[in-house]
Design a protein with these regions (language model features):
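Bacterial N-terminal signal peptides that target proteins for export
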Residues: 4-15
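Sec/Tat signal peptide C-region and signal peptidase I cleavage site
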Residues: 24-28
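Accessory recognition modules or surfaces
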Residues: 29-30, 99
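Active-site-proximal helix/loop segments of hydrolytic enzymes
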Residues: 55-239
């Protein structure tokens, strides 16, 4: 073999190795399924000013997808049209995802609500509770990653000044009190998922002041960026 042919073969092998490495890196990029909680037929809680939880969920889920894209994390939006009726069908529709994140907004017990009039329409509110919280299931096949991602998201949110609520500790035990991660073992979208999964409650829409914050686009973007940053850190740790 001539020296020229040897160099050509070596160059080809080097190029092939680079292509393979690039393909491997692309494959290793995590895929996050972002689920819009609730449906058109069952739109969830109604805010203090009469807006459906589904509308809040859709707005934030879209921003989380955009924030993940900005960090070069692949995403798939689940229930974008609000028509997936089955909770089990949500994670089942994305078996290839590396993580399942379900976006929700919180309400308050009926016994804690007060009636008021908003723009001529009777509504209900409670200003007792405000803040985000998270849920994972110990029945999920990868509880460790589910909990780790909850912790990293919680840490990022609090570092940015977005504080959690302890409202849900009345019914759901903490797995990590500092970062507001609770156990919700029988929540279908969490334990039916084939991948680590977390349900995120962005805030309490029955709280009149927090509702306005949760509707603010700049704050939604800020929250989405912290969620995305925490989630990427969790999913790429050690890769």
């Amino acid at each position: 073999m001539t020296m020229k042919k040897s160099r050509e073969r070596h160059g080809f092998r080097a190029t092939l190795a680079l292509i393979c490495a690039s393909a491997t890196a692309a494959t290793a990029t995590p895929l996050v399924a972002v689920d819009v909680g609730h449906t058109l037929q069952a739109p969830g809680a109604i805010s203090a000013r009469g807006r459906s939880e589904l509308a809040f969920n859709h707005d934030l889920a879209r921003k989380v997808v955009d924030a993940l894209h900005a960090l070069d994390v692949r995403t798939v939006l689940v229930n974008a049209d609000g028509r997936i009726e089955s909770l089990q069908a949500r994670p089942a529709s994305v078996p290839q995802a590396d993580f399942f994140l379900s976006i929700h907004h919180d309400s308050t017990n009926a016994s804690e609500l007060t009636e008021w009039d908003w723009m001529g329409t009777p509504q209900t509110f409670s200003d007792r509770w405000a803040g985000h919280s998270m849920f994972v299931s110990t029945r999920n096949p990868d509880l460790a990653t589910s909990l780790l991602c909850g912790r990293t998201i919680g840490a990022r949110l609090q570092r940015a000044g977005l504080m959690p609520t302890d409202k849900n500790a009345r019914r759901r035990a903490y797995l990590d009190a500092e970062h507001a991660v609770h156990a919700f073992d029988n929540l279908v979208v969490l334990y039916r998922a084939q991948q680590p999964a977390l349900l995120f409650e962005a805030g309490v829409i029955k709280h009149r002041d927090e509702e306005l914050l949760l509707r603010d686009e700049a704050r939604q973007q800020r929250m989405a960026q912290e969620i995305a940053t925490g989630l990427k850190a969790c999913l790429t740790a050690g890769r």
